[in-house]
Amino acid sequence: MAGIRSLVIAPQWIGDAVMTEPLMARLCDRGERVCVAALPWVAPVYRAMSSVAEVIELPFQHGALQWAERRALGRAWREQYDRAYVCPNSLKSALLPWLAGIPIRIGYWGECRLGVLTHRLSNPPRDRRPPMVAFYADLASVDAPSRNPSMAPDPTSPSGLSGPWDSSAPLARTQGDALRPRLHVSAEQLHATLQTHGLQVQGHVVMAPGAEYGPAKRWPVSHFAELAAALPQDVVLLGSAKERALCEAIAALAQPGKTQGRLLNLAGQTSLPQAFALIASAHRVVSNDSGLMHVAAALDVPQVAVFGSSSPEHTPPLSPKARVLWLKWDTQGQPPLDCAPCFKRECPLGHLRCLQDLSPQQVLRALSEPPTGVLARVPTGS
């Protein structure tokens, strides 16, 4: 497959972008030159991937069709790419490869995309879908014929598929290290960021208390504050500008009781590469199920990930240094947490037990114990 020019249309969320890294690695390993088209706020994720040759920042707004702009960009890309891999399931995400006339356009069934994709994979409902990292990596399983003579099919491909294809076969569920996302931070970026904030390597704990999806994925402010006050290390609060107030509330509650170390609220004050550097150099990371959770896993940093309305069986932090706390796994819980995972933005029952009942002491205990592997289930009993 040497010489194949491949365009990947990236997801719009940081966590999803991180989870596409094994797809990039697969494409690169088999000789494809990978160019990623991404919205500006996720583009830095792809610049931290060694398998990506080029990153194009798309001039689009979140949720906007912007037909004229898409058509103009599609025309500018004509004859530049041999294949396109469309990670999101939306129609508008598949329009650019179609408008560019890319001969092979691979993606999942979704949102009336029959005419704009040449190769479509079956798209099971969420409760039957593999972990998202495998879901994205499976886009590389399509062995499509090419109109370009230099793109001969790979005879070693496990799929053995050819021609316009709609798969009804089960998706691959390959496990192991090949599906672990990897990100890289340069030594220069790391040291410059630490120097700016007066921090030392492994001298601070990063807390990422936000979750863009909604409050049903956020461990309570009071719990984060109590944990921050109990830690001997410096604590760095990270998040977007929208999460600045959330982090301010944590800092206000934690500061009076924090007698050791500093508490730095850097939410909205760092670039994404700087946030990567602060995470890469951290002693530990504590987060909800969020984009920065996946960043920590991809940077191989010891972490504790708190899950509420979502499921670690669907979007786990894929790292041997990750520990997952999820009360759904607590068989001694009274009453049992039968409502999780609900995948809702807000608790439909109004109690948010999946997060309220997970104490700071339980998270502190998990932080002090050595990580045991991917999806390590931490006992959540008192």
Task: Cite the ranges covered by each PLM segment.
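Catalytic machinery of carbohydrate-active enzymes
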Residues: 1-382
